[in-house]
């Protein structure tokens, strides 16, 4: 029975959320030697955005960005998922919160991977095109959003007005490094009941064979 319960635990653990979109390479690789600024008004006041597409509806659990901090303050980045408005970011759909601290960009890895969590109904997205928008509200903080694996190209947008909703300049440039993860599926109560009942039956049969 212990073996069967172990199988149940393993099967649940394996039901992790899917990768919905990524510009990272094998082993979450990215270009840590180049990137675009995400900074406050005492620098360039740059807001940087990358487009992504969902082939079907999904719930976002988090986004992972490759970010590094330039010398100065190290205020958290605010990350948004925005609608697509004719090839540039549109209205804010969801707000994601930074988890942890951004490492120095000059550490030999361009900083590192930083997780931004999404929670609530806002994270349920329909199929379609969206934008991931990184905004730094602290005037004295400058972050660098590293480039994607092998500097692959895609739709990227910028503005130097410090506004997460534009106006935008957009083009087909080297993308930034990021990944969007889906939420883990939650089994229906009925499915869990059937599974557990099946395990109990299998365990009873095994016990009978061992005692025979």
Predicted regions and their residues:
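Extended extracellular/luminal ectodomain segments enriched in beta-structured repeat modules
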Residues: 55-62
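PGST-rich, cysteine-poor low-complexity/disordered linker and tail segments that act as flexible spacers
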Residues: 17-20, 40, 50, 71, ...
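Short, charged juxtamembrane terminal tails flanking transmembrane helices
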Residues: 209-212
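Bacterial N-terminal signal peptides
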Residues: 2-11
